[in-house]
Amino acid sequence: MKWLCSVGVAVSLAMQPALAENLFGNHPLTPEARDAFVTDLLKKMTVDEKIGQLRLISVGPDNPKEAIREMIKDGQVGAIFNTVTRQDIRQMQDQVMALSRLKIPLFFAYDVVHGQRTVFPISLGLASSFNLDAVRTVGRVSAYEAADDGLNMTWAPMVDVSRDPRWGRASEGFGEDTYLTSIMGETMVKAMQGKSPADRYSVMTSVKHFAAYGAVEGGKEYNTVDMSSQRLFNDYMPPYKAGLDAGSGAVMVALNSLNGTPATSDSWLLKDVLRDEWGFKGITVSDHGAIKELIKHGTAADPEDAVRVALKAGVDMSMADEYYSKYLPGLIKSGKVTMAELDDATRHVLNVKYDMGLFNDPYSHLGPKESDPVDTNAESRLHRKEAREVARESVVLLKNRLETLPLKKSGTIAVVGPLADSQRDVMGSWSAAGVANQSVTVLAGIQNAVGDGAKILYAKGANITNDKGIVDFLNLYEEAVKIDPRSPQAMIDEAVQAAKQADVVVAVVGESQGMAHEASSRTNITIPQSQRDLITALKATGKPLVLVLMNGRPLALVKEDQQADAILETWFAGTEGGNAIADVLFGDYNPSGKLPISFPRSVGQIPVYYSHLNTGRPYNPEKPNKYTSRYFDEANGPLYPFGYGLSYTTFTVSDVTLSSPTMQRDGKVTASVEVTNTGKREGATVIQMYLQDVTASMSRPVKQLKGFEKITLKPGERKTVSFPIDIEALKFWNQQMKYDAEPGKFNVFIGVDSARVKQGSFELL
């Protein structure tokens, strides 16, 4: 039996040798061995012990660690989240091993979305890299650091397709596109779980939020979703399935209702689709407090009814409430919930614990007690090099008039803006165990880059916002946004004075961390007025103006696009954000990021996304017609389209060549272009391939991303980029909900973004 690193564990196991030998050992991590083990264990468990396995407790004011330890002793807890130090986790696992009857280990989970202690760019930023190697880096480092803290599971990746930037949680996902979100999520699952979630430095993933949470009406958090089956399965479901096909061991159930039924009580979603059609074998976990919310949804009469509905629908674990532990015993006794249903849920929980290797070693992610870090936040535990490399790839160059960028590391540079020196905000939302004072701000990054070669003048210039209502909201639980005691005009005057003395102005503007988060939906997606006033004043100085955007959603930037000489979209870039942004500003790194989500011109354009349907009256800007699908007071397309991003060099793409004008159902067609770097710098770009089903049994999108490749070329260098197309790329869910490809013409578009493309076509026979 593997040595368990705790005196308490050794004593408790010695007291019950037969049980210990049966429960812990070198168990093969195979489905067959797992099923036999769990079946045997279930026979030994009481009803209360089974129910205890279904309870997922959040450490916090309502559940302090001391109280949780008592619950653990009584077998009332199956898993813990929101504790992230080895010492705390070890103490809780010790309680299980020393005091509970069956000694079934706990698992420990946390929201490790874009890093654990080293914070990487938010998921929108990571998606902007269009680089799966970058995703793998983030996944492996995040898993390493999470496991090194003793964690077994992460509530990630978030693969909700989002086409509404009003939604605050758009920052957590990979953007508007089904294909990109699917492949990013799949890659993240594989990277985090490694060969096995039981490995020392791997963690189990939990794909979320199932399902269609990114389509909430009005972009309003926790709102309802109503859509056709075709749209659901063509656009929103594939990323979840991709993550599960990649091996994710868990699914977090969404808070929203879908077509009138809350996901938490939707047996069609959680059983018919997830279990029966997709063959999912892992656990389903409710979102925070979602089971009790069934009463407010109006699909449960009282707490007991909510528990009955949720468990029967297929929710295995109840997060952050006591409903299962309080009401399941009575429901079992009355027969309203069967023992078979309870056993199914308990089996799923025990299965993932087995897959995590916890029945081989409950301390597998803790290591010896002597190895616990003296300083949990020690600098040596960070992965700064990897964070900087990924952050550079996440930066998108939106504008560069007259080659304003890259900047010179000489002269005088004014760095202004409320986000220029904010260590907290550069990390973004869901920054896990990241520590703000370890992050590098844009101001610090610029200072590091220029050294003594240039003079840096800094002025805050404005508050994030002067709207008291918004400030009060952002500061509801803590002082997240600090308001400068000076008047707005005094702050602008200081910034203008700095600008007048400078050769160039770098203004760092956008959103605070809390403005792009859960429960942070916005009806106005412009930069706050306080910062817009600052930008206008800086523009009036006549000095070259570079905007560095820090935000977690697309912003409406029509005016700023007119005012700025250069614009960098940096999202929330993480621990090394400031250094990475400075690398791009000064040309030490040539930007190659591309937008994973369209930027609307105004909130009135929402939703604006590239893969829309053509309609019967499509707008043609070359042949204006009043009676077409358009706005009369705004341009039809987005300000910046999906896939868009500039470089310090230029690229040309040749016409599309196809290996054949026709394709058999069991064959392939290869589409190719030749890409040339026509500029003076080495640079990378993302070549994107889109398909259009021209005529089908139902209207199909004008184009859909089906492949991409990031390439690096030296000046004058050429490269042929090829994309194989098979039948899977052509399939869709039709009106009869049959997943198939239909014969006919298909257009192929290849280019550097979704708008600038070259076209070819072939026929599926």
Curated annotation (Swiss-Prot):
It catalyses: Hydrolysis of terminal, non-reducing beta-D-glucosyl residues with release of beta-D-glucose. It holds the Pfam family Glyco_hydro_3. It comes from the Bacteria. Its main location: periplasm. The keyword Signal applies. GO terms for biological process: glucan catabolic process. Residues 1-20 form the signal peptide. InterPro entries: Cellulose_Degrad_GH3, Fn3-like, Glyco_hydro_3_AS, Glyco_hydro_3_C, Glyco_hydro_3_C_sf, Glyco_hydro_3_N, Glyco_hydro_3_N_sf, Glycoside_hydrolase_SF. PROSITE patterns: GLYCOSYL_HYDROL_F3. It is found in: Periplasm. Gene3D superfamilies: Glycoside hydrolase family 3 C-terminal domain, Glycoside hydrolase, family 3, N-terminal domain, Immunoglobulins. This is Periplasmic beta-glucosidase. It comes from Salmonella typhimurium (strain LT2 / SGSC1412 / ATCC 700720). The gene is bglX.
